[in-house]
Amino acid sequence: MSAPSPHSALDIILERMAAAAGDRPMPQLLIVAKTQPADAIARVAESLRARAGNEGHVAIGENYVQEALAKQPALGGLGLEWHLIGHLQSNKARDAAAAFDWVQTVDRPKLVEALARHRASAQTPLNVLIQVNIDDEASKHGCRPEDIGALAADIAARPELCLRGLMAIPAPDPDMARRRAAFQRMRGLFDALVARHASVDTLSMGMSEDYALAIAEGATMVRVGSALFGARTANTPPPFPADPMSSEST
């Protein structure tokens, strides 16, 4: 059986998201566009915008700064909201601060300082999520839960940045009960951050294989790529050299 088209897949994803949310507000769908050409992104973005009840910006997630920069000229007229969801090295902060509306992978003070320094005063504040290494994986980036408070205070003190919440990628455990527990821990950390910072409203967690579970546990944004476009094949290399510790946010 062939995989559903992106348009059919989009309908399935939105239905599952709504069912998982129940009577809570519909979470935002972030379209993960890693390795996808600009024309494919445009078609899905237009389909999402056309769906009944889809209000606000269509959000596009990219893992690599260079890949986003290469695609943005062709997509500039669509009013897309660009999110960086891959690990950001400090030497790429200048380009990221200029090109993205959100950076979801802030995990250290040096990066906070660099993004604030390079965000132009003519731009609106850069929306920032703190990436949390919720399962304490050596192979993943992200701050420790106990470091969230200090990092959040640093971000909130900088007018060039806007603290919006938390992001996490739990360990890819086949036991969904353990993933649920990780999502629940993230929800607890998020609720604590909401109580301290009025700007916080976003909990980004859940990907193609577990977005419904993440929504059930309180995600306000899910990052979906392979469930929408189809799985990337093993012979499809990343468009840019991969960080060996880079997160796979699909």
Regions found by a protein language model. Give the residues of each.
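Conserved acetyl-CoA-binding loop of GNAT-fold acetyltransferases
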Residues: 218-222
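Glycine/alanine-rich phosphate-binding loops at beta-alpha junctions
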Residues: 226
